[in-house]
Amino acid sequence: MMSKRFLWLAAWLTLFISGPVRAFDHTHRSWNELLVRHVVVSKEGYSSAVRYAGMQSDRAALKRYLMTLEEVSPRDYESWGKGQQLAFLINAYNAWTVELVLQKYPDLKSIKDLGSTFRSPWKKK
């Protein structure tokens, strides 16, 4: 009887201490929702443009998505298939680029204005 109680208590404490484990959303649903709301595709379908004013108003949602990216450990990333890894990298690159633009928005005319001749905007600390 005592050992069952001990095992139950140990299992409960393990769950309590470790906290909830959230699996990474490989559908990137929250990022896709932002894109649906704030990206306009050209009539021809060959290009698109971000509506940064709208994205700025949804910045809290963008930051929440970026936090989910930051929570991915190298071990988790390495356990994914190549397609999931590629989707993660592409979506992370694009989401962080939007965040970089929003840091200077609305005073920014072009993303190219973020850097300089000798310094990439992506190497900024």
Mark where each language-model region is.
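Acidic/His-rich structured neighborhood in mature extracellular/periplasmic domains
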Residues: R59, R64-K125
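N-terminal mature-domain "stem" immediately C-terminal to a signal peptide or N-terminal signal-anchor/transmembrane
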Residues: R22-T68
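Bacterial N-terminal signal peptides that target proteins for export
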Residues: M1-L9
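Bacterial N-terminal signal peptides
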Residues: W8-F16
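Detector for Asparagine
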Residues: K4, N32, N91-N94
